Structure formats: structure tokens, C-alpha cells
Amino acid sequence: MDNNETPIETFHIGKAIKAELARQGRSITWLAHQIGCTRENLYKIMRREWIYTDVLFKICDALDHDFFKACSDWRKSPSYPKNANQTDNL
């Protein structure tokens, strides 16, 4: 991380999916068709910071991209909040 960068407090899976779609030049409609959901549902998924793992597996397969690794890499990075492992409300 560059010294001028602000740490990323959360890994937003929806934004990560949207960025990968753009990088590949694919559309929301294409991905929705690939994973068997409506475009509207996919927009809802991409607005969230969280996702069901079965849906993420489908998206990973469709885009040939490992979002699980991306999330894991973020968790190991300096951007990961130091107090994120606290589970006061569990």
C-alpha cells in the first residue's frame, strides 16, 4: 500500500465483482445469465458487502476469477482493520 493511500476498512464483494466485470468487458446481463439469476437480482447482490458462498462460487466460475482469494489477500493486507477479529456481539 502506498503511504498516501487510505486503508480500506471493508472488502466490498459487490464492488470487486463489478470491477472484474468491467475489466473483462462483460455486462451485468451476461453474468446474470451465466449464474442463472435476473439482472435485477445481480444488481442487488453487487450493492451488498456480503454474498452467499454458493452464489460467489457461481460468479467465480463464470468470470474465471477467484474472489475468495481476493478477500483472503485483503484480510492479510495492512488495510485489514486490526480490531476486525473482535467478536463482541456473537
Report each predicted region and the residues it spans.
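Short alpha-helical DNA-recognition segment
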Residues: R23-Y43
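Short Asp/Glu-rich motifs
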Residues: E40, I51, S79-Y80
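Short, basic-rich loop-to-helix N-cap that marks the start of a DNA-contacting helix
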Residues: K44, R48-D61
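Short C-terminal boundary/hinge segments that cap the last helix of small helical domains
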Residues: D64-N83
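Short intrinsically disordered terminal tails
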Residues: M1-D2, N85-L90
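Short polybasic/polar patches that bind polyanions
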Residues: K15, A22, H33, R47, ...
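A short, Lys/Arg-rich alpha-helix, primarily the initiator
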Residues: M1-R26
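Key DNA-contacting residues within the recognition helix of helix-turn-helix
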Residues: K18, Y43-K44, C71
